[in-house]
């Protein structure tokens, strides 16, 4: 009887544990590639990562959830405003479905952006968090940025005379 109880408990424990989502490894590679491409400032290549239907959260105070066109404009704004952009990831982590808490194949990452403001020549380095969710074709359908975007823009703005 004790063996049966032990086997039942082990089976229950194993069945309740969540493993890695089968798409996570593929989506992780796409995420890493996105960062590699973004820093080259090849806007057309960056645009190709996004599905036609996207919801993306801006990092600016009060920033809206953006559609594809707005998201690409937002990203182009960063590329146009900065030079020598670099991403130094601290880690990449699996994401979870917000409703179920179960792994959903999405990718989250913490790291540092650095570069130089085009207009002022001032350099920056800031800690950021990003999350990306993908469709079955490996295109980004949801994502967002968290960091002090407004503070960064103010810190590297040209000095007022």
Feature-to-residue mapping (PLM):
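Positively charged n-region of N-terminal signal peptides that target proteins for export
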Residues: 1-4
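C-terminal motif of bacterial Sec signal peptides marking the signal peptidase cleavage site
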Residues: 12-15
């Amino acid at each position: 009887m004790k063996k049966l109880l032990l086997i039942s408990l082990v089976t229950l424990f194993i069945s309740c544990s969540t493993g890695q989502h089968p798409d996570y490894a593929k989506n992780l590679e796409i995420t890493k590639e996105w960062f590699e491409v973004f820093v080259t400032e090849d806007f057309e290549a960056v645009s190709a990562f996004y599905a036609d239907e996207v919801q993306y959260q801006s990092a600016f105070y009060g920033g809206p959830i953006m559609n594809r066109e707005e998201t690409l404009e937002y990203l182009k704004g960063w590329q146009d405003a900065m030079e020598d952009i670099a991403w130094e990831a601290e880690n990449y982590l699996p994401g979870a479905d917000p409703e179920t808490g179960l792994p959903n194949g999405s990718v989250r990452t913490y790291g540092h952006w650095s570069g130089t403001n085009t207009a002022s020549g001032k350099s920056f380095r800031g800690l950021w968090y990003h999350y990306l969710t993908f469709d079955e074709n490996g295109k980004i359908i949801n994502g967002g940025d968290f960091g002090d975007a407004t503070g960064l823009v103010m810190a590297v703005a040209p000095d007022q005379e």
